[in-house]
Amino acid sequence: MTSPLRLCVRRSTAPDAEGAATLVTLRLPSDVTCIEEAVELVTRHCLAGHAATRTIRFRLQVVLSEALANAILRGNRESLDKWVDIRAELHDEVIRVHVTDQG
């Protein structure tokens, strides 16, 4: 079975207008079984090529897990016909994560 996740990664040596050097977007269904894979994909691609400490990696994984669980369980009420979108932006000193549900 193929994964229902839709991943897009954009890396730039020159930051875009918003200053993001790495942009990772991911769309997943409102299924809690997809959370682990989504967290792994976003973390791996967002931090690839950067000297992130174990603490930063762990914190990003916790933030993503909690935000996705909230979006799926509370926002979309586990409705499988709804999606959750993640946008992670890696700037020089900051990682911004946006999680959007359809609820």
Which residues fall in each region the model found?
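A short beta-loop-alpha structural element at the N-terminal edge
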Residues: 28-38
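Conserved beta-strand-loop-beta-strand hairpin that lines the nucleotide-binding pocket
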Residues: 1-25, 29, 72-103
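Conserved short strand/loop->alpha-helix "switch" segment adjacent to the catalytic nucleotide/phosphoryl-transfer site
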Residues: 40-65
